Amino acid sequence: MICGLILSRLVGPGCEKGGRAFFPCDPYASPFPSIKGLQLHNAQLFVQNFQNPNTPYSRLLLNWQTGTGKSIAAIAIARQFMNHYMNFIENAPWIFVVGFTRTIIQTEMLRRPELGFVSYKEVAELHRLLHIAKQSGSTTSVESRHLNGFISTLKRRLTDRNRGGFFQFYGYKEFASKLFNITSKGEEKNFDVLSLFHRSDEAEDTLNENDISQFVQKISEAETNGLIRVNQKIMEQLRGGLLIADEIHNVYNIQERNNYGIALQYVLDAFPPHQAPRAVFMSATPVTGSVMEYVDLLNLLVPRHELPNGQPLQRQQLFDNSGHSVKWKKDALALVERLSIGRVSFLLDTNTNFYPERIFAGKMLSYRDEKLPYLHFIECPMSNYQLETLKQLGPDPKISSNAYSIYDMVFPNPKFSKQTEPKAYGLFNSTETPAALSMASTDWLLENGVQIIEPSRRTPFNVSGSFLSLQPPTHISGLAFYSGKYTQMMKDILSIIREGRGKILIYHNRVRMSGVLILQEILQSNGILNEVSSPVGTTRCSICAAIRDDHTHSDHQFIPVRFTILHSEIEPAVRERSLALFNASSNLEGHQLRILIGSKVIVEGLNFQAVRYEMIMSLPLDIPRLIQVFGRVVRKNSHMELPPNERNVTIYLYVSTTPDGGPELAKYAQKLKEYILIQEGDKALRKHAIDGFTNQIKIDKPMLESLPLSPSITPANVGATVLNTFEAYGYGEQEVKTISNIIISLFMARPVWTYSELWKAVSTPKLIQGITIDNKLFSEDNFALALISLCYSKNQCKELLIQNRLCTIMHVPAKPEHLYIAAVLNHKKEPVLDIETYIRDFQPPTMHSVRITKYLEHSQTKEPFQVLYEKFQKDFQDEPIEQVLIHYPASFHYTMLEALIIDNLAGMGALVEVYKKFFIAFSKKDIQPFPDIFKIISHVPGDDNTLVGYATEDSVRLITSRKDKTWHEIPLYMLNINVKRKENDIVIGYMESKGKALKFKIRPPIQVLKKNEITDIRMLNRGAVCETRGREEQQKIANQLGISLNLTKISAIKLCLLIRNNLLQKEMEARNQPNGMQDGIRWFYLFNDKMPSLVHTS
């Protein structure tokens, strides 16, 4: 009876694929699911089996397109070597992972239990800790520390030999510096490893191959002379080991002088061939900056003894560089083909089942009557003001590296009172523009809608203001005046938002001047918010792009458009949080974060999910890197959460043009010519790809990623397959694991199987999605082994998670054939088998977490505002009203300020005067000297003395509607408030929360702390409660402050009160001096002042 009920629920679609074994079928049931967990695809399986300890192949280049799983393939290869090294009794070699993206590889290893470095339970615990740490909202919380500790423990397992680790992870720079240690003698002589080599062309800064063949000998000579010390520990670890180098094109790129490639070349060539480490190199674009990099690539890829005459290749062997351009020599490409045989894996996967469709907006352009291949552009004619500025560079301008902004925009020029004057031109040079704008008068800045963003340690000089707006005030020239390109970008963004949902990635290679920082200001000037700002009347809706004041749509709620930004000057932890939020499934449509602006830090190693639009504002050095930028958003399975009709990415490639083409278009034309030469080398490199016969890549016409290509395949009679090494080399174990995953997936489809039915289903090709190998070749012996390993026995319960149920597979003897039933487990982890087995949905008790630290903080320090308000009214009937600033926490003051502004509390005139005296609260009269800002609050009812805003530690909040309780935030500097006023030379006072109390603390001024050399971080004076200071120190401070009482008869508590009140009085006086909030001396930090960070930097 039980079996009859269960068998009646067999899966519908897909039944017939397996033959009669799958009848009867329920026509309404779901199809068989995809196999769960990580499954290596064919290309990954092939290279894993090709490059392993049991094959003779020493070096391999994974030339796979971006997003196809190079890192997983490299880890799979490394796992085979690790399994082999574990059999060594002593002196086992190491696996070195070197590259700028090594943390990405570590992350993959720790989030994929199928790779064998972590268990499923550890991954579940990692996800749990990640969730809790994210809820804490702080990278320094207890929860975040627990997460970091857990991750560190897992990482140590990879690198600690005592814990079974076989890996070493290095950045390229770190690896080179640790391999080549400059001695003190070498430092005295300013020795540089690169000095061992001459330069063939100083302008290109590339190595001379006439000397490169002797570099091992030269390094040995330098070591003998005491200039350098080669790290023998690293050399011994690499002897017979494995070297994985990610993004290999970075080690020999001519754009930047480095010794990364020399370090790799040295460790590969310093050993006899049979002791040299194996090597796996990875890159979607192995040659980038110059076609001549092929020489460096082949010298790394081909062992020395297999190169012509046993010597490194030289550039003159492959290239003719006699004229104005580089050309391939005759037979050079044939040599590349021959040398790359057996050493290159090529993968270009365009399967639309897994990858989003790539769509180019715009049109193809020509430069000087030559059509530019491959790329479509959004043509952006320069504005007249840009053209006038370009004329300053002459008739055929050569754009220097500090003049790159001319490609994008120009800035207002203080040389001209009005930018619309005849012959007026703008600024664009990165060395001149910041100085010129910084020295401009306040009147000129206001007249031209420019606001200076003062630089800080992590924020370089930048500008904002209405000159970046599409709709500026009538007397100000707006964005269209200064940039045709950015005007078009802004119009396209608004059009995309109006047309529907979809996330946008904006790329610019630069950070400063016309780079990502100004893009951030352009978005904000046109109604798009950053991650944290509150909406105001001009904020745009993420659904219809209307501004909030005009938002009349009844079919949807107003949701502000928001953006985030990633660049090298943002803390890594902040970048990771922003990226996680942008990629989150909850942000699929972009209503939490619609736009991400990224600099060149996003070109390699980062993945973006479900991006529908990519806007490229500048060329990233060369075309191969442009391909890398495309690959950030076109990745395998990157759009699987979107509906099928939305699995595409539209790419906007913006270029500024002039009537005769322009310098930016000329740059693209030159780089595309260079890229054609690189493509010819790529074609030769890939012709004999080791997996060409399995991937069956055939490219009929030129495309961005490849010239026409047909793999060179020579049919051969290989005879019968030799199976006697199948088990010995571990392939049988891999097959058992694969079959186990298939069996679990089948039990997700139906809970009861007979042995023959199950074997039939397992061996049926394409029955379950995600299996790329030929099921018909499975061994039934391995199937039986997999089934037994999953089945319940009384001695050991095999727990499985099937359809969200904690299950086991029960083996039930029956006639005529035994049954295998997926039975749920009860709380004792015993299988339950009855008539409801197939529908019972048992789940273990859900765990709930409480943030203890947050609870304690709230319960100990927060009192209801009403309680504090009543206490305030009672305490300050007779006390000096200024004392309110130091007796109540920031939460009370901010609530009070908003109540004063919104509700106009009666009887609070004295408190309002205190807030105004310390420049904490602002009336309409206070804002009137700033016309651009006054426009924001001019419509707010009330006379000149009406409060309209208050200062926080980061900004000034201005009321825009008392009824709706909406605010507009502006930077502090816009009201001439300098957050970094110079501290006095005596002592600094401030209040700090201790439980429900506020304690008065003092510390030395920051300039004194900087002068003192502190060798022990524990000795860094971060401040202390005044009463805990020594009596002598208290009296010294009081004397320096001019407190003229008889201090010997005053208690420590009274003395500290005198010091506190004195500092508060001096702070008020300093603020009320002319320009006091800009240049006044700092004595006391109030509740809304940001304290400088005190960290030990030595």
UniProtKB/Swiss-Prot annotation:
User: Which PROSITE patterns has this protein been placed in?
Assistant: HELICASE_ATP_BIND_1, HELICASE_CTER
Task: Please tell me whether the keyword Hydrolase is annotated for this protein.
Answer: yes
Matching InterPro entries, A to Z? Answer: Helicase_C-like, P-loop_NTPase
Q: Where in the cell is it found?
A: Virion
Q: What Enzyme Commission number(s) apply to this enzyme?
A: 3.6.4.13
Identify the keywords attached in UniProt to this record, alphabetized: ATP-binding, Helicase, Hydrolase, Late protein, Nucleotide-binding, Transcription, Transcription regulation, Virion
Q: Cite the Pfam families for this sequence.
A: Helicase_C (PF00271)
Residues that hold ATP according to the record: 64-71
Per the entry, induction is:
Expressed in the late phase of the viral replicative cycle.
User: Which Gene Ontology cellular component terms are annotated?
Assistant: virion component
UniProt motif DEAH box: location = 246-249
Gene3D superfamilies per the UniProt record, alphabetical: P-loop containing nucleotide triphosphate hydrolases
| Record field: transmembrane | none
The reactions it catalyses are: ATP + H2O = ADP + phosphate + H(+)
The residues covered by the Helicase ATP-binding domain are 17-317
Q: Does the keyword DNA repair apply?
A: no
Please identify the protein, giving its name as recorded. Answer: Early transcription factor large subunit homolog
UniProt source species? African swine fever virus (isolate Tick/Malawi/Lil 20-1/1983) (ASFV)
